[in-house]
Amino acid sequence: IYVGNHYCLWDVFFPAHTTKDGIHYLAKDSILHAPVIGGWAKGVGVIGAMRDGTDVHTVMDAMRVLKNGEKISMFPEGTRNKTGSDEFLPFHGGSALLAIKTKTPVIPFVICTPPRFLRRTHVVFGEPMELSEYYDRKLTPADYEAAEEKLKARLYELRANFRAEQAAKKKREK
């Protein structure tokens, strides 16, 4: 499961460039019905999710994909972050739930600079992480929230490490 922050529609292409295998995407259900992009979304295997979080079929479809050994990319913020802030939007919990229920590793990635036309976008991928401390036990909503916070902390860490490396590089160049 690829899990990252979300700035724009083009963010979906970053995880796709890291794998030769196909990749599915978890996205809002309305994408599948959009006039132009809907056909493309269906063709690349988008799994539509209802925004209210009550769609059991979405979870079941995603679990089936993962259990078949296929990959999913998702943005746990649930929508594009248009705030201009460095803070991530609140995570909605689905990524940790899927990783735990299917015992699938999470590949965290962070988009360090918002994509801009004709500008370099920096995307950092972390090492796969397991949420194995949550496997094979009865979990509470607080447990899922803690797992999701662990993922969010890893994204912040990846971005902080990238920025520290960039600052050190600039300092050496002076």
List where the protein language model places each region:
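Catalytic centers of nucleases
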Residues: 56
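Catalytic core of membrane glycerolipid acyltransferases/transacylases, capturing the structured
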Residues: 1-53, 61
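Non-catalytic C-terminal accessory region of glycerolipid acyltransferases
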Residues: 59-174
